[in-house]
Amino acid sequence: MASPIAGIWLGTLHAGGSSLRLQLRIDTGNGGSLRCTLDSIDQKAFGIPCSDVKVSGDAASLAVPAVRGGWSGSISSDGKILTGTWTQVGPGSMPLTLERQQHAIEAPASAAPMPAIPPVPIDQIKSLLDKELADALAKGLLAPATHAGVTVGIVQHGQKLVFSYGTAKDDSVYEIGSITKTFTSLILAQMVEQNKVRLDEPVRELLPPGTVAKPAGAEITLIDISTQHSGLPRMPDNFHPAHPDNPYADYDAKLLYEYIGKQGVAKPANPPFLYSNLAVGLLGQALANRAGQPYPALLKAEVIGPLGMKDTAITLTPSLQARFIQGYATPQQPAHAWDLDALAGAGGIRSTAADMLLYLQAQLHPDQLPPPTLAAANGKTLPAALAMTHEVRAEVGDGVHIAMNWFHVDATGSYWHNGGTGGFSSYALFNPEKDFGVVVLNNYAPGDNSIADKLGLHIAQRLTGLPAVSLAP
């Protein structure tokens, strides 16, 4: 017998003066479990996975981890209407009623890839992009009315290039969001090389005594977290921001430990890939505990100090703050900066394109770090630590594996990660075999208004002579 919630549902979410059509597709999979995807139609985001679909009597609920949201409410007696509340980190709670539909609204056809051209050398890439982005600059994502700014950094065979479009400057400071996770994994690798921790060490052993009970069986280790196979959820269930526009600011170590104490650190049998901000934030906090210093100080000591990344920080100095570009959620909605406390290791870094090129150059050539880096405190372990973070360790799916918080595309040999906050998006990629790296920093939150992922991948494809994703507005 089909579940009363199975079917196609359509509703409109009203938030911040704008309206978004949301569509749920729910069916029953093998074994009777409910499967669900969310479509944000007006944002052109389709097929976002749901989880924890539950029905009890006329009550129903589901979670959408990818957007840190979920819906709960009730099913009408005739089974045609879902009445309830959409709750999401940032916007908060909003009423959302959905009606049963006979047919789904399908995703529009994506723009065809731009034809392949011979590989473009670094000294010609900007002139090509100026032409390819002309429409976006005139009437699309980078048009003056959007307030958008984007800074691009490219390194190829040791040659570096930084340039900007829109409201950005070459030295603008951005939030890099979840690219921070790769820094946290590099700290882990550094501390392994320094014999301060082990990859297979239980995370419990790095937490204050009594925080969480030792499980009866296998427990979550540091490498489980660094490969996103810990089994921990994307976010803790005691995450209730006092200020939705700066949601992570008041989530401190006390709340984190309280949650972990309740959740436990038992490792599921054969845990699947499950992307978790909570887990990597916990890793950053745990490593800081072992090092005996706060995460920002540990980050500086192990990574950004030795690499000479002077414009990279968790908390900005006055001079960096003066270059911190305004972020946007939408063209009409400036975004508050995000300040991360206990979960800083998952997404708290701010940086510039030039500094990120120092980081990517180190990724490309761990065995060729400059003498000042090797001579710095903690610098001598960086070559081995960087190499450790590149080792492919688990499958993600669809030709993608994961190293230590770097995704690895099997077909191209590229490593990448992206990031997003309330007003910023970012994309970083490097390819050791072809010896190039790309970073794109954008002052728009991820979604329909962001160009970071698309532009970053496009540049990588142009550098290597592959058909390139369209930059059409």
Task: Give the ranges of each region predicted by the language model.
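Central antiparallel beta-sheet cores of small beta-barrel/beta-sandwich binding domains
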Residues: S3-S77, T83-L96
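A structural signal for short hydrophobic beta-strand segments in well-ordered beta-sheet cores
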Residues: I26, V53, G73, L98, ...
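Catalytic loop of the DD-peptidase/beta-lactamase superfamily, centered on the K-T-G motif
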Residues: G79-I81, T85-F163, A288-A291, A297-A301, ...
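Active-site-proximal loop and beta-strand segments within enzyme catalytic domains
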Residues: L142-A148, Q156, A168-N277, A291-Q293, ...
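Secretory-pathway/luminal and periplasmic proteins that interact with or process carbohydrate-rich
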Residues: L161-F163, T211-I220, S230-N238, P296, ...
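Short, well-structured active-site flanking segments
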Residues: F183, Q190-P209, R290-P318, P370-L386
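Well-ordered alpha-helical segments within folded domains of soluble proteins
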Residues: T184-S185, A279-G284, L357
